[in-house]
Amino acid sequence: MKKIFVSFMGVIAALLFTACNMDVPLTHNTDGDKPMETVQDVTNALHGAMEQFGGYRFMGRNYVATGDFCGDIANASASTGHFLHMNGWTFDENSGELEVMWQSGYVIIVACTRGIEGANHVMAKVSSDEEKQTLTNCLQQFYGLKAATYFYLSNIFCKAYSAEHAPGLGLVLVKDEIIKPEQKVERSTLEDTYKYILELINKAYTYDNKETSPFFINPINLKAIEAKVRLYMRDYTGTLAAADAVVTSEAYKKVDPKEQS
């Protein structure tokens, strides 16, 4: 019996020692504490940020659903659970859907900030025109995605832009460096938030992005983002200029509404 027990304990010990070495090496992710070293690292970071942006925590559900439930376009019940407080206007800053949107938005913002730093780091190392163009494409998309994320966050967590509300609370601005653990942060003004959004968009324009897919940030839908931002700022001249650039672009096929009726 003693021999059986000793053998059994030996097997358990072997399994435990084996389990200690079962960590799977990352193949598509980069440790956030380490700089990006390859074009693929930068591309993966962009795809990760885009996935988070389109996921249910942010634009894929929560952002759109918040407007639907608060506006009584959709109805919630105790059995569904989600968005019940939104539907009844009994939510506060601790409501789950709002917390998730805030956290997810800043995950995207941090990912874009890291991506910009990584793309510039890798750009200094590569020599081929193809790799440089890929990184240039990524840089415009990171800046554009960061701007869009701040814009949509401001729609949820800030008052509507106006001269009266401009000095009021905006968002925490993460600029060239990510916020360190335990670093004290403050919300900027609404005016500074919108100024930073436009600054990001203008910076994005400085990169000659060759991306044409409508599923990614490209020069045309970046103009559409600018048009929407300026519309919310009540800058109607700027809105018309940006919107006209989209409408008159030959990048996408125009559809006649009469053909769809």
Please provide the spans of the model-predicted regions.
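Membrane-proximal, proline-rich intrinsically disordered regions
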Residues: 20-68, 243, 254
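Short coil/linker segments at helix-helix boundaries
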Residues: 125-133, 156-191, 195
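Hydrophobic-face positions in mid-chain alpha helices that act as interaction patches
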Residues: 39-44, 60, 73, 80-84, ...
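Conserved, well-structured interaction surfaces
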Residues: 82-157, 188, 203-210
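Alpha-helical solenoid repeat scaffolds, predominantly canonical TPR units
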Residues: 111, 193, 200, 207, ...
